[in-house]
């Protein structure tokens, strides 16, 4: 265990283009090799595509997609007397949102499509409609927690 103090949590500033903290978090997760402007352009293009296809507010759809992909419970490994149990635990709001964004980005990257913006737009629209890989991952996580409910008393 480290002897240093825990790193101070930095506040997430709203995105200058969309005035949304969630958009800033998404840009951070989209970014590769420190190329923030590229990540911002991908998100902006994805929102443009969503606006074209649905005609609605892309930011609202994005927030709905993140909400639909956010897990409420997860399983964590806990060793008790030589055996490892999958213990279901509640997920804090902050961690749940971070997991949802991570899943949305990773499943967007795994999709086959032309540009990253198109893949991201597709995944966000699917997630907003309670479909897509990110929502399936959340359901899987919830099923795992439900299946291991018997070990809930091992919570720490």
Swiss-Prot record:
GO terms for biological process: translation. It comes from the Bacteria. GO terms for molecular function: rRNA binding; structural constituent of ribosome; tRNA binding. The keyword RNA-binding applies. GO terms for cellular component: small ribosomal subunit. Keywords: Ribonucleoprotein, Ribosomal protein, RNA-binding, rRNA-binding, tRNA-binding. PANTHER family: RIBOSOMAL PROTEIN S7. One of the primary rRNA binding proteins, it binds directly to 16S rRNA where it nucleates assembly of the head domain of the 30S subunit. Is located at the subunit interface close to the decoding center, probably blocks exit of the E-site tRNA. Part of the 30S ribosomal subunit. Contacts proteins S9 and S11. Belongs to the universal ribosomal protein uS7 family. This is Small ribosomal subunit protein uS7. The gene is rpsG.
């Amino acid at each position: 265990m480290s002897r240093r103090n825990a790193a101070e949590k930095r506040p997430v500033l709203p995105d200058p283009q969309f005035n949304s903290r969630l958009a800033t978090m998404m840009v951070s997760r989209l970014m590769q090799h420190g190329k923030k402007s590229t990540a911002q352009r991908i998100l902006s293009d994805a929102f443009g595509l969503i606006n074209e296809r649905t005609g609605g507010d892309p930011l609202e759809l994005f927030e709905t997609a993140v909400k639909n992909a956010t897990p409420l419970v997860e399983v964590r490994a806990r060793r008790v007397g030589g055996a490892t149990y999958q213990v279901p635990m509640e997920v804090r709001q902050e961690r749940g949102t971070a997991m949802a964004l991570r899943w949305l980005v990773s499943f967007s990257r795994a999709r086959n499509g032309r540009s990253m913006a198109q893949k991201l737009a597709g995944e966000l629209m699917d997630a907003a409609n309670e479909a897509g890989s990110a929502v399936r991952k959340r359901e899987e996580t919830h099923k795992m927690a439900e299946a291991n409910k018997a070990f809930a008393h091992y919570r720490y």
